[in-house]
Amino acid sequence: MSQFNNSPVLALAKDLISRPSVTPLDEGCQTLMADRLKDAGFNIEDMVFEDTTNMWARKGTQSPVFCFAGHTDVVPVGDLNRWHTPPFEPVVIDDYLHGRGAADMKGSLAAMVVATERFVKKHPDHKGSIAFLITSDEEGPFINGTTRVIDTLEARNEKITWSLVGEPSSTHKLGDIVKNGRRGSLTGNLTVKGMQGHVAYPHLADNPIHKASPALDELARMKWDNGNEFFPPTSFQIANINGGTGASNVIPGTLEVMFNFRYSTEVTAEILIERVLNILDAHGLDYDINWIFNGLPFLTGDGPLLDATRDAIKKVTGLDTDPQTSGGTSDGRFIAPTGAHVLELGPVNATIHKVNECVKVSDLEQLTLCYEAILENLLCQ
């Protein structure tokens, strides 16, 4: 461990982890980052929307604009008794930094700041601009976070050229995978109406569970598309289903079903909605349904950002990275629709959202070098 005793990225990561910023709280994390970025020549703009703290920091006024994006909020710690160390008291054990947010994603935030400090010091006359878009609402309802900041930037025609999101993209080794896209996400909340009654008198009631079951089975078996070379086929999953009073002798009056699509670029949300409604109507259901659009699919193909990232990872780690679109959503889905090219590169994701979350300190050192090399590849050429 002695080799990391004076590590600036480790020190900053510890400072960030020690702040219990359970979503949507920030607990001063952004101020900690802002103070460092001010010293590096950044202008800081705080954007607070209701319960969410956001920061837009920018150095430079010219294009192209390279933007680090990330979040200071973390998920709840869960059962404290299952943690080997207190989740907000960061400690290093055998090269692993332990604490909530170590991998998702305070380690990445520390690497971003330190990499930027080093880059600006080495290249004070770099081309273009560097920006940070940081929110405390990524792990929560994502209403007042990145999406609101993007709306503000769009309203004043402030554009991002390239964005690197620090989500933990790696699977086995740092840099083995980068995310160059994400599937779209669409949630449906369905209420099927029936008539409550006694189970002994079914002719006097109307069981919504029985009525809805064939339609739900058809939805679950439906092949929505074949996917493509970048995305797997669209997935339909029932996430929650609730009906009944808890009594064994009562036919329920309603059935509530929550389902989610993770969809490829082969379909649109509008097409999925139309097909779902056609199936529900074909089964003669009496229902209400509302939809939540969680994000459009996006894909960043070959180009300067992906090339710069591939080169940096190869230079630092020796790995040939594999661009993938698998996994959940990230705030990249709010940045990509502006026309920006978006990638995700961060630590190994094996312990994210789990008890005893941790990250290799040596990986944070390498991640910092990767971020710095990406800046050099894009803004010094």
Swiss-Prot record:
Pfam family, one: Peptidase_M20
Pathway entry: Amino-acid biosynthesis; L-lysine biosynthesis via DAP pathway; LL-2,6-diaminopimelate from (S)-tetrahydrodipicolinate (succinylase route): step 3/3
EC number, UniProt record: 3.5.1.18
Top-rank taxon, per record: Bacteria
Positions bound to Zn(2+) 2: D104, E139, H353
Catalytic activity, as annotated: N-succinyl-(2S,6S)-2,6-diaminopimelate + H2O = (2S,6S)-2,6-diaminopimelate + succinate
Record GO terms (molecular function): acetylornithine deacetylase activity; cobalt ion binding; succinyl-diaminopimelate desuccinylase activity; zinc ion binding
CDD domains: M20_DapE_proteobac (cd03891)
InterPro entries xrefs: ArgE/DapE_CS (IPR001261), Bact_exopeptidase_dim_dom (IPR036264), DapE_proteobac (IPR005941), Peptidase_M20 (IPR002933), Peptidase_M20_dimer (IPR011650), Peptidase_M20A (IPR050072)
SUPFAM superfamilies: Bacterial exopeptidase dimerisation domain (SSF55031), Zn-dependent exopeptidases (SSF53187)
Residue numbers annotated as active site: D73, E138 (proton acceptor)
PROSITE patterns in the record: ARGE_DAPE_CPG2_2
Biological process according to GO: diaminopimelate biosynthetic process; L-arginine biosynthetic process; lysine biosynthetic process via diaminopimelate
Chain sites annotated for binding Zn(2+) 1: H71, D104, E167
Keywords from the named record: Amino-acid biosynthesis, Cobalt, Diaminopimelate biosynthesis, Hydrolase, Lysine biosynthesis, Metal-binding, Zinc
Cofactor: Zn(2+); Co(2+)
Cofactor binding summary note: Binds 2 Zn(2+) or Co(2+) ions per subunit.
Membrane spanning stretches: none
Family: Belongs to the peptidase M20A family. DapE subfamily.
Assembly mode: Homodimer.
Protein function: Catalyzes the hydrolysis of N-succinyl-L,L-diaminopimelic acid (SDAP), forming succinate and LL-2,6-diaminopimelate (DAP), an intermediate involved in the bacterial biosynthesis of lysine and meso-diaminopimelic acid, an essential component of bacterial cell walls.
Name the record gives this protein: Succinyl-diaminopimelate desuccinylase
Phylogenetic placement of the source organism: Bacteria, Pseudomonadati, Pseudomonadota, Gammaproteobacteria, Alteromonadales
